[in-house]
């Protein structure tokens, strides 16, 4: 969990007017985590095991990925493009391979700007569908998607 707490607070301030609530969120983020007998300071990410950590991570990714896709990226591509995200797992599906390759580079830059990076072991471009050249498969959210002609 490497999200930038300063960006997260800016994102929250965009939608939340209650300064007291925002102050509590800031304190939660800075509180640190006990590891054994030592308190580990927290200047990045959200505290592991924190009840609201998944919600905060979702807010962060909403601004970093969802808004970027909806308000910017999608408008500049000539082919069909689809985006599905659950927590920090997501798929981008493109009609044209050259657009997939271009967006892969843009995505790396976008994530880097916000202190994030792609999981290289889970990241790839593959042909999929009835005209696909290979029969590769992929896993997403515990399901395996097979590339078959039927």
Which positions does each model-derived feature cover?
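Active-site and adjacent loop segments of nucleotide-processing enzymes
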Residues: 139-150
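Conserved polymerase palm-domain catalytic core
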Residues: 1-128, 132, 137-140
């Amino acid at each position: 969990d490497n999200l930038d707490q300063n960006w997260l607070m800016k994102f929250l301030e965009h939608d939340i007017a209650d300064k007291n609530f925002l102050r509590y969120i800031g304190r939660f983020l800075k509180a640190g985590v006990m590891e054994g007998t030592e308190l580990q300071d927290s200047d990045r990410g959200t505290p592991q095991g924190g009840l609201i950590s998944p919600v905060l991570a979702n807010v962060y990714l909403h601004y970093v990925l969802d808004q970027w896709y909806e308000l910017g990226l999608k408008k500049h591509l000539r082919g069909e493009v689809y985006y599905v995200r659950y927590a920090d797992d997501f798929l981008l599906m493109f009609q044209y391979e050259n657009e997939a390759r271009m967006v892969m580079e843009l995505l790396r830059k976008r994530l880097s700007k916000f202190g994030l990076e792609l999981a290289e072991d889970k990241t790839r471009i593959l042909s999929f569908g009835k005209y696909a050249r290979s029969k590769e498969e992929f896993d997403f959210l515990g399901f395996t998607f097979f590339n078959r002609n039927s």
